[in-house]
Amino acid sequence: MILASKGPFSGNRHRTLVSRLIDELLKKRVTILTADYEGYLKPHRQGRHEPDVVGETSSGLLVIGEAKLCEDLATLHTYEQFSDFSNRAMEDGPLAGRAIPFHIITPMECSPALHSILKDLNLENRDNIHIWLSG
């Protein structure tokens, strides 16, 4: 089922998730290059959509991050994002061809829906997809 609307407070809750994802990536020593968050430049399009966070590891490997609220999971937009972001690979340099890690953060109560969507998209066993649960 594809949903279409967001609640009135979804912007604040989404920003909180983006902040938590940035914090987790920083703990993993990922340098945040761009983020849809105050103090950062907005990320550029990766495929059809802009992710919430783009970072880089010390080896130069890009990292893509996306925050999703429960009500945003079952949308065409999210399906396209997950497909696009999970299938990105490094284009040049010594890491050319290597899959770009894709980090997804969502509230803990959304975990079953997230796993169901990843299964629907045949992404549930991808090594480059990392799930963070908040709350």
Identify the meaning behind each predicted range.
Residues 100-135:
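Domain-level recognition of nuclease-like catalytic cores that cleave nucleotide substrates
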Residues 15-19, 76-89, 112-114:
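Well-ordered, non-membrane alpha-helical segments in soluble/globular domains
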Residues 4-10, 73-80:
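Short, flexible/disordered intra-domain loops and linkers
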Residues 53-79, 85-86:
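Conserved catalytic cores of phosphodiester-cleaving nucleases, focusing on short active-site segments
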Residues 2-11, 27-59:
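Active-site metal-binding core of divalent-cation-utilizing nuclease and nuclease-like domains
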Residues 87-99, 123:
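Arginine/glycine-rich "motif VI" loop of SF2 helicases in the C-terminal RecA-like domain
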Residues 40, 69-74, 108-112:
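Short acidic, S/G/P-rich loop/turn micro-motifs used as interaction or catalytic elements
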Residues 48-50, 60-64, 97-99:
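Short connector loops at helix/strand junctions that flank enzyme active sites
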